[in-house]
Each structure stands twice: as structure tokens, then as C-alpha cells.
């Protein structure tokens, strides 16, 4: 069983963490994140470390303990280093382009599919078959990347579609003729 909740979170230089009741505010060079946590879980800041503790060992508190610690760590890493997800478009005629603040995908439909990035998330298109989603909020970066991938997920026969960089797509054999 994982003991992720017991690990301390080291606050890097340039990042400030403040607690107001059960609400944590994390400020850093990339941005600011505010999140309210369950008041049953205790969060303490000691020097440049954050400790998360739980009141009892019941199942609900154990689950909240690890989750709270992981979310706080993601917030600290996000405002200091940021997160990015890379996607690649595989298929004949599949391409992406950036028009202003919109991402326009041509992926075999009769119409182009458009995405507008939420506040704090940037979309880059280094090549017409590559998309990079960057931001300081891991949740928003992952959600936007998943929504882009969901437009045309990779199919198992030819492998065409939008996939994460390095994602392995299980391939299937086609039907064999008589």
C-alpha cells in the first residue's frame, strides 16, 4: 500500500504557500492556484516544508490523506515548473494549426474542430502534426489534452488518430478474406 500522504512536500525557492483555514493558496513564478481541502485533514507549513496529517486511520481519512498531499504537491510543482502534454496527429491529411488563441484541428471530419484554451493554459503547434498543451494547473492541462485526444482517438487497425506522445496503441489484425 502506498504511503504517499506521509511524505513531506518541499517548497522550492520563489514559491509561497499560505493557509487560510482549509484553503491553500500557492503562488509562484508561473501563476497562482487556490484550492479548498477537506477540513478534517490537517495541513501544516514548517519552514520550507508542508506536512499533511489525518485525524484517524479509518478508510475515508486514509484516502483523503494521500489525495490531499498529491494535489498540494501538484500545485507546488505547477507554479514552479509547470506541466505540459504533447499530442501527435497521425493520419493522412490530419493537421493542427493555431489561429489567434484558438487551436483548429483538421482530422478527417467535414468541418474543422476548434478549441479555445482556458485561462492559464497555452497551446503550441510546433509542427502541423504536433500539439503541446502547457500550463501551471495539472488538472486543466490534462483535461484539455484529453478533450483534444477525444476528437479522434487512435483506432486499433491503422493507428490513425490523435495520441499522446509515446502512447502505445494496441493494434488488431484486420479480417482475412476467404
UniProtKB/Swiss-Prot annotation:
Lineage top rank: taxon: Bacteria
Keyword hit for Aminoacyl-tRNA synthetase: no
Record key words, sorted: Ribonucleoprotein, Ribosomal protein, RNA-binding, rRNA-binding
GO biological process, one term: cytoplasmic translation
One Gene Ontology term, aspect cellular component: cytosolic large ribosomal subunit
UniProt xrefs under InterPro entries: Ribosomal_uL6-like, Ribosomal_uL6-like_a/b-dom_sf, Ribosomal_uL6_a/b-dom, Ribosomal_uL6_bac-type, Ribosomal_uL6_CS
Single annotated GO MF: structural constituent of ribosome
Record's function text: This protein binds to the 23S rRNA, and is important in its secondary structure. It is located near the subunit interface in the base of the L7/L12 stalk, and near the tRNA binding site of the peptidyltransferase center.
Family designation: Belongs to the universal ribosomal protein uL6 family.
Subunit structure: Part of the 50S ribosomal subunit.
Name of this chain's protein: Large ribosomal subunit protein uL6
Gene (UniProt): rplF
